[in-house]
Amino acid sequence: MPRRYGMVEAFAVASGKGGTGKTTSTLALGMALAERYDVTVIDADTGMANLLFHTGLDDADVTLHDLLVAERDVPVAEAVYDRFGMSVVPCGTSLAAFEAADPGRLRDVVAELAADADVLLLDSPAALGSKSAVLPVVLADRVVVVLQPTVPSLSDGLKVQEYARSYGTETAGVLFNRVRPDEDVEAISEQAARYFGGTTLASVPESDAVRAARRAGEPLLAHAPRDPAADAFHEAASNLDVRSGDAADVADRFRSAVVPDRP
């Protein structure tokens, strides 16, 4: 996909707690958006990395962890892999690497990646309990909040939005995921419309194909492109209003972003 020269927007894909299917959603949105944009997906969940298992990168030689350790001085390009029409930056799973990583270095990494992308998707940690967890939300232009259609999930998502807004990051939209047939999405959607800044992007049904895709080491849209869940993710990508930002300005903002100690 030829990129729109010099234009970029960064989205954090976030949720209040684990289990919402955030990584599945990040990659599905990425593949759908890659039909129109040059997309880079970054696994910014440095403590509980998961994206590498969804993209067949279990044995990746270089990951985001390597870029976040100053002593290693690894070029950013070495951690970027072409997968499923996207550029993917996985994160490793080593506890030692996580402890050695400096989350603040993520600013420079994202700034460099912004030069070669129209859309950056930051797969963010599910909880906001540390500096490494909150930084992706702080860096992003806007956040996509992934929820399940329950009141507790809605409450958790609102906490993410409240924190994001405290750093000037607005909500791009809400994505309801893993929706079962017996769940009343409409009622929860009405509440979400009242409390969240962005629109409801789509309602994605629970699907066995998602688990099968994970076992195969593939994103859902590659493994089962005609599954109803895949269709819903395409709908979400279509409803996501991607805005134009000057790549140089965005990179400067990333590099100068305030690094919070914790929420």
Model segments located where?
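P-loop/Walker-type NTP enzyme "switch/lid" segment
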Residues: S15, A44-A115, R215, P219
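G-domain G4 guanine-recognition motif of GTPases
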Residues: G16, Q148-P149, A172-D184, S203-V210
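Conserved C-terminal guanine-recognition region of P-loop GTPase G domains, centered on the G4
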Residues: S155-T169, N177
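Beta-strand-loop-alpha "switch" segments that mediate conformational coupling across diverse proteins
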Residues: A192-A224
